[in-house]
A protein has these predicted regions:
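Short S/T/G/P-rich N-terminal loop/turn motif that feeds into the first structured element of a domain
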Residues: 12-17, 37, 132-133
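Generic low-polarity alpha-helical segments
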Residues: 10-13, 73, 137, 155
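A short, solvent-exposed beta-edge/loop patch
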Residues: 104-160
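Second-shell loop/turn segments in exported
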Residues: 24, 71-78, 135-142
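Short, solvent-exposed recognition patches
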Residues: 32-117
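Soluble non-cytosolic domains of exported or imported proteins
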Residues: 28-29, 81-82, 142-146
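Gram-positive cell-envelope targeting signals
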Residues: 1-28
Length: 160
């Protein structure tokens, strides 16, 4: 069984998300730009397998993954927003399958401008799953989500 601990350091992330509405920016950031940022940060993006590429593959229109050390960041774009919501629910469940519904809610944040974010530390690994519009981000790291949060802010998925 996985041990689940809320990620307290993500309060800064919540601030970033919460203040995003003021920017007026509602479009989903470009996954190609996302890949460029990953490469600039030292992530390998060539021949990196997708952790969740199997889910609703027929509606997956674009996917980009990066790996560096034990950290992974993956960006999935789907044909429609409804599919993204369903995939988000499935991945957040697979990330912490033993979490009771009420406890799961404590790890989830509704994002200003639409979408949701799920964060958890399980078995010493930090996980983040978020969706906004037609795009889903899955990330994990054995160290922290600090660099991943920086990447997400720089690419527009987390808003300053």
């Amino acid at each position: 069984a996985r041990a689940a601990v809320p990620v307290g350091v993500l309060l800064a992330v919540l601030y970033i998300f919460g203040s995003g509405a003021a920017s007026g920016r509602t479009e989903t950031p470009d996954p190609v730009h996302f890949a460029q940022i990953l490469q600039e940060k030292g992530y390998e993006t060539a021949d990196v397998s997708l952790t969740y590429g199997r889910i609703d593959r027929n509606k997956l229109t674009q996917a980009i993954a990066g790996a560096k050390g034990g950290s992974r960041v993956e960006c999935y774009r789907y044909a429609d927003d409804k599919t993204v919501d369903l995939v988000y629910n499935q991945i957040s469940y697979e990330t912490a399958p033993d979490l009771e519904p009420r406890a799961r809610e404590s790890h989830e944040t509704a994002l200003s401008g639409g979408g949701k974010m799920f964060t958890i530390v399980a078995d010493g690994v930090y996980y983040l799953v978020l969706f906004r519009g037609d795009t889903l981000i899955y990330a994990c790291s054995p160290d922290s989500l600090t660099e991943i949060n920086e990447i997400l802010a720089e690419t527009g998925y987390l808003r300053r």
